[in-house]
């Protein structure tokens, strides 16, 4: 992993936007010269990347919202965040 922990507070990098692609009927992250399609789970996580909430807080919110195991949600949130960070879509 690239230094991402449960205390990381990610936000979208400058030039990256979360947008609904109406032609595809799908939410995407738009970055210069690329588009990353998001599934429903990645979308609810990406919507919370505001630079103020930690990954632990995001995981707790999602666990409560979906009545799911908090530890598993946190592991999944960290994994997704690491993937998007490696693609240079997030800042920490």
Curated annotation (Swiss-Prot):
InterPro entries from the UniProt entry: PQQD, PqqD_bac, PqqD_sf
Pathway it works in: Cofactor biosynthesis; pyrroloquinoline quinone biosynthesis
Keywords: PQQ biosynthesis
One GO MF term: quinone binding
GO terms of biological process kind: pyrroloquinoline quinone biosynthetic process
Entry superkingdom: Bacteria
Family statement: Belongs to the PqqD family.
Subunit architecture: Monomer. Interacts with PqqE.
Function: Functions as a PqqA binding protein and presents PqqA to PqqE, in the pyrroloquinoline quinone (PQQ) biosynthetic pathway.
NCBIfam families on file: PQQ_PqqD (TIGR03859)
Annotated protein name in UniProt: PqqA binding protein
